[in-house]
């Protein structure tokens, strides 16, 4: 009976966090709008080999993540939930692997359930796991690969070992097809310390080639298909998207070595109080084979991405699966022996909630700021934000009432965030980062437009997805579409600022021409170097400028 209650509680938890509130949040540009539009175009065109964005070749990532996203929109429709369905599914599958692996290591159902709940409620996991990017997919394949390797190395028969390594190769191959060759480097780096300390080199060298073969066979069909269709894909993807992005001095998203320290601290909420103890307990217990495996799995990718020139918080998502297992194991021991860390965790959550309440007041219309984040007419959004932090502090306090038994309720600290964050986003943020909001405000003007031009790829993708059209033209800036725009068949998909007046004269009689521009809040629209317009509709950071036939 208790097991049934736990399962009902887990399903209710998943529904409240990962299902019910998802449709209430508009898509963010540039990431969510980009991936939403790529998958929409894949469904519309039926081309499941070559990824396109705005009808242009888009070679920044391989294909597998777009497949999953496309299936999500096919099943649930072109809506906010449909766009995010793929990443939610991947996150829940990763949580299922956390459950299975914890059971495999400790044979403790309660520990497995706690590890799963901790993983799903970690701030970084929830933030990325409900956000339509490719990182939850690669995190799933990496976690699946690490589980497969452990399964292979623990098998007692050659059939079991062979099956484990074949499965490892498949997961690595799918990882390559999701985000590239990092799916090969990360698992290798993660297992090497464990293999060295356990002296398991023999099994690795005897059976490792099976993983190589299955990985190659997994990638080969699509790899050959896209090489035939687009011969320069692999050259661009390898040199630009891997070498330049991560290793060279001009790498994207450059950040210092210590960049991931605050990411881990913030990402570990609402379980931050368990982080030091979990790592220290794991180190103390390093003679235990499974603990070494989890530690290596956590630390090695973190070091690898810290050394790399380019960094983003999403890169280390897979590190939090083993960390959740270590936290759950440590928390159960602490509850029995010394609950100090659990009390500290409760106080951290109280402090975080109270700080958020104060910060919300400071940036509210009633606070001391001359330019508040929310305007007076957005009072309900301020109260939503207060509710988010109040619930966080409340559940932090509740865990202290009988800490040995109530500490798992820290998983409910982000409940307000999950349910209310979509209702608390300030209009000034929505107007710049949520193209859906802009489209809703300007739908009647946008719909009949013969041509739509914009100076932002993220906004262009949002317009294309909302209006169900892929012919948006880039104006003045090419951004990440620069490579695709270099192809001869992309001629006419970019108009520079100097060419716009002549282009307008040539195309004006064909129908309504609409410019959607990103502007600064204090920027004077009249100072823009464009011909006089028939209609100007400013929505804070985005402005619609329209030219009608004459």
From Swiss-Prot:
Listed pathway(s): Lipopolysaccharide metabolism; 4-amino-4-deoxy-beta-L-arabinose-lipid A biosynthesis
Cited Pfam families: PMT
Cellular component terms (Gene Ontology): plasma membrane
UniProt record, GO biological process: lipid A biosynthetic process; lipopolysaccharide biosynthetic process; protein O-linked glycosylation; response to iron(III) ion
EC number: 2.4.2.43
Compartments it resides in: Cell inner membrane
InterPro entries noted in UniProt: ArnT_tfrase, Glyco_trans_39/83, LipidA_mod_glycosyltrf_83
Keyword DNA repair recorded: no
Coarse class of the protein's main subcellular location: membrane
Broad class of enzyme this protein falls into: transferase
Keywords of this entry: Cell inner membrane, Cell membrane, Glycosyltransferase, Lipid A biosynthesis, Lipid biosynthesis, Lipid metabolism, Lipopolysaccharide biosynthesis, Membrane, Transferase, Transmembrane, Transmembrane helix
Intrachain disulfide bonds: none
Catalytic activity: 4-amino-4-deoxy-alpha-L-arabinopyranosyl di-trans,octa-cis-undecaprenyl phosphate + lipid IVA = lipid IIA + di-trans,octa-cis-undecaprenyl phosphate
Superkingdom in the source lineage: Bacteria
Bilayer-crossing regions: 7-27, 81-101, 111-133, 137-154, 165-185, 204-224, 263-283, 288-308, 315-335, 346-366, 382-402, 406-426
UniProt topology in membrane: Multi-pass membrane protein
A GO molecular-function annotation: 4-amino-4-deoxy-L-arabinose transferase activity
Homology family: Belongs to the glycosyltransferase 83 family.
Primary role: Catalyzes the transfer of the L-Ara4N moiety of the glycolipid undecaprenyl phosphate-alpha-L-Ara4N to lipid A. The modified arabinose is attached to lipid A and is required for resistance to polymyxin and cationic antimicrobial peptides.
The name this protein goes by in its record: Undecaprenyl phosphate-alpha-4-amino-4-deoxy-L-arabinose arabinosyl transferase
Organism per entry: Escherichia coli O1:K1 / APEC
